Amino acid sequence: DKHIPVAAGMAGGSADAAAALKAMNMLFGLNLSDEQLMEHGVKLGADVPYCIMQGTALSEGIGEILTPLPPMPDCLIVIAKPAIGESTKWVYQNLKVDLLEEHPDIDGMADALKTGDLKGITDRMANVLETVTIPANPVIDSVKKLIAENDSMGVLMSGSGPTVFGIYDNRDKELAQRVVDMLREKDEIQAAYAVSPYNIRRGM
C-alpha cells in the first residue's frame, strides 16, 4: 500500500513497474533472480532496477549499475509535493551538463553513509536537476526556502522534481510536524508528510 504519485520525482512509476515484475515472477513461478528482473526492469525505466533491489544504493549509468550502501541513519524526513507534475524526459533533455559549476560529492556522501554521519550526509546533498526544474517551477524554490527557514539540516528537490524533502533530527519531531502543517495550509501543495527512512535489509 503505497501512495507515491507519478511525475513527482520519487520513482512512483518505477516502483509500480518493479512491484508488477516481482508479482508476475511469483504468480507465474518464473523463479527469476532479482538480477534477472533488474535486467528486464531497466528496459521499462531507469529507476526500476533500484526499486527491485531496494535499500540505499549508488546508482550509475542510466540506473542499471547499482552499488549497495549502508542505510540512511534514522531521522525525520519532511516531504512536500507541489500540485504540479514534471516530465523526467523533459528535465534530462534540458540539462546542460557542460555548464554545471558544481558536482555532487559522491565519495563524501558514501563515506558519511558508512559512518552513519547524518550531518555529513545533509551537508553533501545536491541535485543538478534543480538547475532545470526550479527555473521552470518557482514554487519548488518557495517550498525549499520554507523548509530551510524552519531549521532543517538540509533540503533538496527529489529526482527530477517537483517533490521537495527536508531532513530533521529525530529530536525535532514537533518542529517537523509544524513544518508539515504549514505546508498543508498552502494551496500550491498537493501533499505533505513527515516520515522516517524505510530501510530494507536485503535478502529477506
List where the protein language model places each region:
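Flexible nucleotide-binding loop
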Residues: 158
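DPxDG-like acidic metal-binding loop motif
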Residues: 8-34
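Surface-exposed aromatic
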Residues: 164
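Short pre-catalytic strand/loop immediately N-terminal to key active-site residues, enriched for Gly-Thr
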Residues: 1-9, 153-155
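ATP-dependent small-molecule kinase catalytic core of the GHMP/sugar-kinase superfamily
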Residues: 30-153, 167-204
